[in-house]
Swiss-Prot record:
The gene is pdp. GO terms for molecular function: 1,4-alpha-oligoglucan phosphorylase activity; deoxyuridine phosphorylase activity; metal ion binding; thymidine phosphorylase activity; uridine phosphorylase activity. Gene3D superfamilies: Nucleoside phosphorylase/phosphoribosyltransferase catalytic domain (3.40.1030.10), Pyrimidine nucleoside phosphorylase-like, C-terminal domain (3.90.1170.30), Transferase, Pyrimidine Nucleoside Phosphorylase, Chain C (1.20.970.10). GO terms for biological process: pyrimidine nucleobase metabolic process; pyrimidine nucleoside metabolic process. The keyword Glycosyltransferase applies. This is Pyrimidine-nucleoside phosphorylase. It holds the Pfam family Glycos_transf_3. It comes from Staphylococcus aureus (strain bovine RF122 / ET3-1). Its cofactor is K(+). The lineage of its organism: Bacteria, Bacillati, Bacillota, Bacilli, Bacillales.
């Protein structure tokens, strides 16, 4: 088999066999196939696309290129959730203890964040003493006993994906549905998930700007999952504004605690209930989405979800008293109100700009080596559709420096107030095939 034949076959719009895809992935990871041939195939895939069988084969070839996490000692159906990312996306912090409270095992591997705010692990490390460096045996034991644990990423998972991802970045092949879908799904499958729930974001603050593109990606990932024996569902949710009100690590953790108490922002609560219902159904803990939703609401109302979060924090060395004493979380030195320059209705909150403003305060990383300031960030006091009076606070800047002129300048271009009302949609579609 020769790589040039595989490139020409895809260039001419033909279907690659599983053997050909395996040959490419295997050779590329070993270093036998050079970058210039791999980038040539990536471009051919970009223009000619792949069918469902090719996409599934590419995903599994990437899974098999490295280690796979074995979660077979954990009882029950392991359901993992993946979000394509957004600003203020606090869902994992709420979802993990919430679905665990209704007996769904959550064995979460998480990374540190690059970009606007930290990843799930950074947010949890805002809790004094919390750690994710636990060995596999402890991880399995914690999930079996308490239904939820979070561990840092380890092992050599999907090395093929890492290489192809870096290559796509510099060869103009990032926006290819088969390449994005196989990249995301290979990581989830390698991490040991039996079933997968996907939150595909669309809108100005999302990777997929249009609903059409988001749908195409959601269908692609759901089909890959179902084709390789992992029950998969997706929802398409809106990222035309940040989710919830908090952007920043300790601030988002506080918001997660509020949400588990039933006092969280409406949009975050709704998204969590929608995603959580799918997880509960896929874990065979409820027959219908309606029944699953009722179980989750009951877990919040009864305090079971909050109790689960406490035990989870304690199990991983954290100070669980922060649940009842949020003032023990890292606090920024200055709270600066950003006020409306005119009266009207909020019609636009540019997610990415608000995310960047939060990063300028120190809430996120530009490079892997950067330190994060866990206390800083932004809290939105108004969301799209809200009425606002001139001089009223639109958002609060939590900062450890007094001079935030650069941040204010960034925010000036990210908020629009007009004289008409805009009603945002949160959940656009649910995709099951």
């Amino acid at each position: 088999m020769r790589m040039i034949d595989i490139i020409e076959k895809k260039r001419d719009g033909h279907t690659l066999t599983t053997e050909e895809i395996n040959f490419f992935i295997d050779g590329y990871v070993k270093g036998d196939i050079p970058d210039y041939q791999a980038s040539s195939l990536a471009m051919a895939i970009y223009f000619q696309d792949m069918n469902d069988d090719e996409r599934a084969a590419l995903t599994m070839a990437m899974v098999n290129s490295g280690d796979m996490i074995d979660l077979s000692d954990i009882k029950g159906v392991k359901v993992d959730k993946h979000s394509t990312g957004g600003v203020g996306d606090t869902t994992t912090l709420v979802l993990a203890p919430l679905v665990a409270a209704v007996d769904v095992p959550v064995a979460k591997m998480s990374g540190r964040g690059l970009g606007h705010t930290g990843g799930t692990i950074d947010k949890l490390e805002a809790i004094d003493g919390f750690h994710v460096e636990i060995d596999e045996a402890t991880f399995v034991k914690l999930v079996n006993e308490n239904k939820v644990a979070v561990v840092g990423q380890s092992g050599n998972l999907t090395p093929a994906d890492k290489k192809i991802y870096a290559l796509r970045d510099v060869t103009g092949t990032v926006n290819s549905i088969p390449l994005i879908a196989s990249s995301i799904m290979s990581k989830k499958i390698a991490a040991g998930a039996d079933a997968i729930v996907l939150d595909v974001k669309t809108g100005s603050g999302a990777f997929m700007k249009t609903l059409e593109d988001a749908e195409a990606l959601a269908h692609a990932m759901v089909r890959i999952g179902n084709n390789v024996g992992r029950n998969t569902m997706a929802i398409i949710s809106d990222m035309n504004q940040p989710l919830g009100r908090a952007i920043g690590n300790a601030l988002e953790l506080q918001e997660a605690i509020d949400t588990l108490k039933g006092q969280g922002p409406k949009d975050l609560t709704e998204l969590v209930l929608t995603l959580g219902s799918q997880m509960v159904v896929l874990a065979n803990k409820a027959e219908t989405l309606e029944e699953a939703r009722a179980l989750l609401i009951e877990a919040i109302d009864s305090g079971a979800a909050l109790e689960k979060f406490k035990t989870f924090i304690k199990n991983q060395g954290g100070d669980e008293t922060v649940i009842d004493h949020p003032e023990r979380l890292p606090q920024a030195q200055y709270q600066i109100e950003y006020k409306a320059k005119k009266s009207g209705y909020v019609t636009e909150l540019v997610s990415n700009d608000i995310g960047v403003a939060s990063m300028m305060l120190g809430a996120g990383r530009l490079t892997k080596e950067d330190d994060i300031d866990l206390a800083v960030g932004i809290v939105l006091n108004k969301k799209i559709g809200d009425k606002v009076e001139e001089g009223e606070s639109l958002l609060t800047i939590h900062s450890n420096r007094q001079d935030v002129d650069d941040v204010v300048k960034k925010l000036d271009s990210s908020i629009t107030i007009a004289d008409h009302v805009v009603s945002p949609t949160l959940i656009h579609k649910i995709i099951t095939e």
